[in-house]
């Protein structure tokens, strides 16, 4: 990204990430590495981050059976290239409100191509003031009091991830496993609900954002195609 000509493709401030399935040997069946989405062949996924300059800067080997969403932030925090990214694109159905909350706290604008977008509900601070036309889209009230009460702990979580003391994927999985009454988990979820609501509204209104996301995801697909072409025997 330091060569002047690299700016022809982008400024290095946006990136996309996606998983690519690779078949493994027979022992993969014993390790339960089979995902029905890819048929009966066992394998792993290489979850790769590619910058807007077509440069891959992070790659993680993850089980084919897990959701990709928790690993988005892991790749961004792996090195300085990812830390300079401001807008991150991903095509995933496994997102969580915790992911939206953590992404915002770490300074990333998360742009996901969400499946079944019309079915997603919005969260507002005062449902009574919501325009009548939008009330059917509102899923509930954002719990501002819970966010304020737990803000120091939320901030410490963000600092812990930034300092590399814990990987974001580990923290997100841990929070997801907590009982619903865990205040920190619920508070970060509330932050995520607010961020997701803002994103959905912006996505619907901003066609330029949709275009940027499509271009970014296409660059990731081009990188996948190159790896497929270079694989020996496509294996």
What are these regions (language model features)?
Residues 2-68:
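Active-site cores of enzymes that catalyze phosphoryl transfer or operate on phosphate-rich substrates
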Residues 6, 50-54, 78-84, 106-109:
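Secondary-structure transition/capping motifs at alpha-helix termini
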Residues 25-29, 71, 96-105, 121-126:
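A short acidic (Asp/Glu
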Residues 43, 72, 88-89, 99:
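Extended, hydrophobic alpha-helical segments in both membrane/secreted and soluble proteins
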Residues 67-87:
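Short, basic/hydrophobic alpha-helical segments
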Residues 88-98, 116-121:
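Acidic, metal-coordinating catalytic cores used for nucleic-acid/nucleotide bond scission
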Residues 107-145:
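Helix-centered, glycine/charged polyanion-binding patches within enzymatic domains
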Residues 136, 143-235:
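Long, compositionally biased intrinsically disordered regions
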């Amino acid at each position: 990204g330091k060569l002047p000509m690299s700016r022809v493709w982008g400024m290095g401030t946006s990136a996309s990430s996606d998983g690519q399935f690779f078949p493994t040997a027979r022992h993969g069946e014993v390790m339960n590495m089979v995902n029905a989405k890819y048929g009966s062949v066992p394998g792993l996924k290489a979850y790769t981050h590619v910058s807007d300059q077509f440069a891959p800067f992070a790659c993680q080997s993850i089980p084919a059976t897990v959701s990709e969403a928790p690993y988005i932030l892991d790749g961004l925090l792996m090195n300085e290239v990812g830390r300079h990214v401001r807008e991150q694109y991903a095509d995933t159905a496994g997102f969580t409100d915790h992911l939206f909350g953590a992404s915002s706290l770490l300074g990333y604008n998360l742009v996901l191509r969400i499946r079944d977008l019309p079915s997603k509900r919005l969260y507002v601070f005062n449902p009574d003031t919501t325009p009548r036309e939008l009330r059917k889209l509102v899923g509930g009230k954002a719990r501002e009091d819970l966010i304020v009460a737990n803000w120091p702990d939320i901030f410490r979580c963000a600092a812990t991830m930034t300092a590399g003391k814990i990987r974001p994927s580990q923290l997100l999985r841990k929070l997801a496993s907590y009982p619903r009454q865990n205040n920190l988990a619920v508070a970060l979820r509330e932050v995520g609900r607010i961020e997701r609501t803002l994103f959905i509204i912006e996505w619907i209104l901003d066609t330029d954002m949709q275009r940027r996301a499509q271009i970014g995801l296409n660059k990731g697909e081009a990188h996948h195609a190159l790896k497929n072409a270079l694989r020996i025997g496509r294996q």
